[in-house]
Design a protein with these regions (language model features):
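Structural motif corresponding to the C-terminal cap of alpha-helices
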Residues: 102-106
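Conserved SAM-binding loop and adjacent beta-strand
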Residues: 83-100
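Conserved class I S-adenosyl-L-methionine
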Residues: 107-113
Length: 113
């Protein structure tokens, strides 16, 4: 596991999310969802997001590295974006979301033992 790659991925994801958040005038969590959609299908007019998504793909992150990058991103979101008590994530919900994201973002031929 390469912590520099995790830090780079976190930085790219955060820049993308904040750029989308400003462009769409939405909250951090909605912008994060849009960032993931733009990363997966490549449809965006935002040059920063295109460039950062390309750099993210070039990093070739493992599932564990994706998990850690998103874990830090969710921690940042929790610090900057207040949630109502009824909308806060439970540990199980966070686990399900991160597992889903890893399955979508990681290459299917990678296997960690």
């Amino acid at each position: 596991m390469n912590f520099e790659k995790i830090e780079q991925a976190y930085t790219y994801l955060l820049e993308n999310t904040q750029s989308i958040q400003n462009e769409l005038s939405t909250n951090f969590y909605d912008a994060l969802i849009e960032q993931n959609a733009m990363y997966l299908n490549g449809n965006t007019d935002l040059d920063l997001v295109k460039n950062n998504s390309k750099k993210l793909k070039e990093l070739g992150l493992s599932k564990e590295e994706w998990r850690r990058a998103y874990q830090f991103l969710f921690m940042k979101a929790a610090q900057t974006e207040p949630l109502q008590a009824n909308h806060q994530f439970t540990p199980d919900a966070i686990g399900f979301i991160i597992t889903f994201l890893i399955d979508q973002l990681a290459k299917s031929d990678q296997l960690d033992v």
